[in-house]
Amino acid sequence: MIPMHVAVIMDGNGRWARKQLQERTFGHEQGVSVLESIVDECINCGIRFLTVYAFSTENWSRPPTEVSFLFELLSAAIQRVRTTYRERNVKVQFCGERTTQIPETVIAAMNCIEQDTAACTGLILSVCFNYGGHTEIAQACRSVLADCLEGDAVENIKTRLQMPIEQFIQQIDTHLYANLPPVDLLIRTGCEKRLSNFLPWHLAYAEIIFSDLLWPEFSVRAFKDCLDEFASRTRRFGGVQLSPMTGVYSDTHPHSSTNALSNHD
């Protein structure tokens, strides 16, 4: 079984560079090459969504020279893959806050590749840049409240307070940064075992694999191994299924990653 939505925390660039007796920026350069190879593999094996953690809202605390280099690296990568991804039917979108801290040239490059690939219908590559999961949810809730101010605010608020919780959850979901389905598989490289404020809304039932490889070491073979591990797991989504043949509850579940995709095409 191939996951529909794979998310990746690409951790370990700086540590890998230090192991090579190089500057941290060298690790980031190698990390971009690895990402491009993983994108190619996602296309080859039919994965529908790939979401990657490129720059968090907490990364602003890094040295200014490193942050500036990351901006330059992003712009260069966009220019390099822009035509290729359009030709390969890859839709690219950025998730995060586009604040004035980000150089205008970088914002322009992001907008450009989004526009160029907007009509693509293959792999959807979501790049989380200046992203924080708590901020994403808070901004979505703000947008729901803002919607209430259109017309009779008091009545609109009452309506939302009285609606079924599933419907209210759907309203929040539609105001998130991008129209993404739940994550099926999360991969984090770099030895750490935490989520780092990445996609908390989407990770509720994700299978998680923590890799001891640093991101520049993460090969296509390592990615395939993660897919094999995912395929070997039983996803129960918190429940069990009653077998009509035996009358016994089993650990299998009728839901699969394709069900999560239905409202997000």
UniProtKB/Swiss-Prot annotation:
GO biological process annotation, one example: dolichyl diphosphate biosynthetic process
Enzyme Commission number(s) of this protein: 2.5.1.31
SUPFAM superfamilies found in the cross-reference section: Undecaprenyl diphosphate synthase (SSF64005)
Note: The synthetic pathway for dolichol synthesis is conserved in Giardia lamblia, even if some of the important enzymes are different from those of higher eukaryotes or remain unidentified.
Biological role: Cis-prenyl transferase involved in the synthesis of dolichol, a long-chain polyprenol that is utilized as a sugar carrier in protein glycosylation in the endoplasmic reticulum (ER). Catalyzes the sequential condensation of isopentenyl pyrophosphate (IPP) with farnesyl pyrophosphate (FPP) to produce a polyprenyl pyrophosphate which contains 11 (major) and 12 (minor) isoprene units.
Record-linked InterPro entries: UPP_synth-like (IPR001441), UPP_synth-like_sf (IPR036424)
Motif (RXG motif): 236-238
Top-level EC class as recorded in UniProt: transferase
Pfam families registered for this protein in UniProt: Prenyltransf
Family statement drawn from the similarity comment of this UniProt entry: Belongs to the UPP synthase family.
Keywords: Lipid metabolism, Magnesium, Transferase
UniProt pathway: Protein modification; protein glycosylation; Lipid metabolism
Source taxon at top rank: Eukaryota
GO molecular function: ditrans,polycis-polyprenyl diphosphate synthase [(2E,6E)-farnesyl diphosphate specific] activity; ditrans,polycis-undecaprenyl-diphosphate synthase [(2E,6E)-farnesyl-diphosphate specific] activity
Keyword Lipid metabolism recorded: yes
UniProt cofactor(s): Mg(2+)
Keyword rRNA processing part of the UniProt annotation: no
Name of the protein this chain belongs to: Di-trans,poly-cis-undecaprenyl-diphosphate synthase
Catalytic reaction equation(s): 8 isopentenyl diphosphate + (2E,6E)-farnesyl diphosphate = di-trans,octa-cis-undecaprenyl diphosphate + 8 diphosphate
